[in-house]
């Protein structure tokens, strides 16, 4: 139909910026539906049915919000101040720099440490997207991320960074401290969220 504009997206909006939560929300719904349905047949076949299929008895008892009209719906766009948006971009760029360092030095970092580094990157993304969602516990995720980052630096430097960039470890440690302070300020002041 040439006169109907295409609409791209999903019919069950996730209402978060957090990609880790997004990946597990659908799995969690499948697990809950498999547990909640009374039909043993549905408990098994839910894992093999097309995307979006739910057992009939579960749909009635546990409805899930679904977009019925793709041309008129509320998009997920939480209000954020200029300060919060600016800090989010700084967090993103810093995480992007850490990812680039990881890929450039993956051979030097070594097998057990690449998993530590990868897990830390997941925590970085989780922490700043929780702040974007204005989760009241975003400060705790940020504090955990920064504490682990400082611990890793204290243990052995930042995965060989001091060999190529002598100032890099100090800059990274400073970022972790500054990040904790800034996110604590966001968490304490509601004016940052308006």
Q: Predicted regions span which residues?
A:
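Cytosolic/stromal cytosol-facing helical appendages immediately following the last transmembrane segment
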Residues: 1-88, 126, 132, 137, ...
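Substrate-recognition/cap regions that form aromatic- and gly/pro-loop-enriched pockets
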Residues: 75-163, 167-193
């Amino acid at each position: 139909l040439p006169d109907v504009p295409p609409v791209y997206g999903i019919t069950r909006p996730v209402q978060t910026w957090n990609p880790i939560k997004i990946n597990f929300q659908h799995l969690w719904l499948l697990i809950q539906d498999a547990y909640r349905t009374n039909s043993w047949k549905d408990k098994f076949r839910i894992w093999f049915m097309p995307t979006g299929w739910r057992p009939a008895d579960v749909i009635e008892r546990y409805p899930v919000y679904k977009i019925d009209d793709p041309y008129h719906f509320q998009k997920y766009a939480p209000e954020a101040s200029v300060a919060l948006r600016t800090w989010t971009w700084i967090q993103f760029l810093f995480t992007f720099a850490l990812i680039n360092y990881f890929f450039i030095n993956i051979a030097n970092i070594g097998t057990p440490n690449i998993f530590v580094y990868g897990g830390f990157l997941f925590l970085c993304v989780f922490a700043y997207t929780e702040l974007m969602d204005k989760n009241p516990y975003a400060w705790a995720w940020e504090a955990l991320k920064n504490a682990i980052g400082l611990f890793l630096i204290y243990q052995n430097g930042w995965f060989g960074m001091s060999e190529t960039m002598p100032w890099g470890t100090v800059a990274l440690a400073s970022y972790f401290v500054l990040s904790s302070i800034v996110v604590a300020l966001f968490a304490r002041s509601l004016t940052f969220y308006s």
